[in-house]
């Protein structure tokens, strides 16, 4: 474990004042960040490609790329392909220059990771948890897991540049605080960002878990190459994250995509944990599947679910999914009903934002092909033909890593955004951001 009072930068063998020497660079941040983004993403890998993709002049590209190389953020690598004349050098983002800590908190699990500056996973750990235990218990556990990651990699070169947290509820991104989260008792307005910034000497960003899952899918999953992606998490709750041109669409306050609380019935008995009536999450979320499956088992309607109930005393969504895989008609009906409700809500979303890809993830998404088929069938039946002509609906393939990849990607994007880069240029290291009262974040 890292010693108390010792910053992660010291644990990594660094000093908060050291790092890339970009404090001496001129303040033409627009072109500098444009080139850095192109190189970071791999969109452009040589100076001729940068000139073609950005529209910047040869002189500006030469100067900014030289400054980035001098800073240590970018380096010249092997020769690229020649298009006539001398072959250009490939420019490579030095993702090993620093490290990021990322945590995805779900309703029933914690996943933490140490990554490089390109969100490449260096080390990862997942364990069961219960978000209802409250922020003090959960965040202390996250800190302990972070400390273990840092201790295991204390001899690696580089410094900690940022920390990111994904929470399973509405998050006001500008403040980094959950706001009236339905399943997170005690988390409302809790200062999550401050709890980590003072401990780790690095800037901290907090976002909704579905937003970062969506970003992770775009950066490392089936969403690569798509301009408008909707990620739908079907877990204990239901939510959607929207990524447009590589950036999370958060809305004015950060709650864009909260489809789990769209009303799908007027039944007064369908009271959601948010306090409202008839929410999608109350009827089609993991908690609802478990509740309905247990009711069926107690009524003797399902032999398979009845055996599970007798063995463990309760039924959850995973049990319903397993029963559906075995052909249990009751479980299959429950899965089909949930898929129809989800597909109906997504049809409205498709008509509204016209995505090219919808990715289905979360624990309930592992219920099998029947769920995905029902979602597709309902969605296509209720959406406009033009909106679905080229639409793909696929299951996530990231298998538990998408959240932390998305968290780390979000942190890296914020670190190298113009407004943030400008705030730490003079210090030469982003650790200075942890001492600022507030870092303006993109909504």
Positions of PLM-derived features:
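ATP-binding/phosphotransfer module of carbohydrate and carboxylate kinases, centering on a glycine-rich
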Residues: 1-79, 83-159, 200, 266-268, ...
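Short helix-capping/turn signature of helix-turn-helix
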Residues: 41-42, 118, 184, 220, ...
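General beta-strand structural signal in soluble alpha/beta enzymes
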Residues: 76-77, 203-208, 242
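Short, acidic, Ser/Thr-enriched surface-loop or helix-capping motifs
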Residues: 116, 173, 243
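Hydrophobic "anchor" residues
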Residues: 121, 178, 248-249
């Amino acid at each position: 474990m890292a010693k108390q009072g010792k910053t992660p930068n010291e644990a990594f063998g660094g000093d908060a004042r050291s790092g890339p020497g970009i404090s001496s660079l001129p303040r033409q941040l627009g072109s500098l960040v444009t080139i850095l983004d192109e190189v970071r993403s791999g969109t452009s890998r040589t100076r001729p490609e940068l000139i073609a993709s950005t529209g910047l002049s040869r002189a500006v590209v030469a100067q900014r790329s030289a400054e980035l190389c001098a800073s240590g953020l970018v380096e010249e690598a092997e020769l690229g392909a020649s298009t006539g004349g001398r072959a250009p050098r490939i420019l490579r983002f030095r993702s090993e220059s620093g490290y990021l800590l990322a945590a995805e908190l779900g309703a029933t699990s914690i996943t933490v990771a140490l990554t490089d500056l390109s969100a490449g996973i260096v080390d990862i750990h997942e364990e069961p948890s219960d978000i209802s235990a409250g922020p003090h218990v959960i965040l202390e556990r996250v800190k302990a897991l972070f400390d273990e990651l840092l201790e295991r990699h204390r001899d690696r070169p580089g410094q900690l540049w940022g920390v990111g947290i994904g929470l399973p509820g509405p998050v006001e991104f500008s403040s980094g605080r959950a706001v009236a989260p339905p399943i997170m008792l005690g988390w409302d307005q809790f200062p999550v960002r401050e709890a980590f910034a003072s401990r780790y000497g690095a800037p901290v960003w907090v976002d909704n878990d579905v937003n970062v899952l969506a970003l992770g899918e775009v950066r490392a999953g089936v969403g690569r190459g798509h301009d408008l992606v909707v990620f739908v998490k079907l877990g204990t709750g239901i939510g959607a994250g929207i990524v447009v041109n590589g950036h999370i669409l958060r809305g004015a306050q950060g709650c864009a995509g909260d489809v789990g609380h769209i009303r799908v019935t007027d039944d007064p008995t369908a009271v959601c944990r948010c306090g409202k009536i008839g929410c999608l999450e109350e009827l089609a979320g993991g908690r609802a599947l478990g509740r309905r499956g247990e009711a069926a088992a107690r009524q003797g309607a399902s032999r398979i679910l009845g055996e599970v109930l007798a063995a463990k005393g309760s039924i959850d969504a995973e049990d319903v999914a397993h029963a559906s895989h075995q052909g249990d008609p009751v479980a299959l009906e429950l899965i089909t009903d949930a898929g129809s409700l989800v597909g109906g809500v997504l049809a409205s979303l498709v008509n509204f934002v016209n995505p090219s890809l919808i990715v289905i993830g979360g624990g309930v998404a592992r219920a099998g092909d029947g769920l995905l088929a029902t979602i597709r069938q309902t969605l296509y039946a209720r959406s406009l033909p033009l909106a679905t002509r080229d639409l793909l609906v696929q299951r996530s393939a990231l298998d538990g890593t998408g959240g932390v990849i998305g968290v780390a990607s979000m942190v890296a994007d914020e670190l190298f955004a113009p407004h943030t880069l400008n705030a730490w240029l003079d210090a030469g290291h982003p650790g200075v951001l942890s001492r600022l009262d507030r870092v303006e974040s993109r909504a």
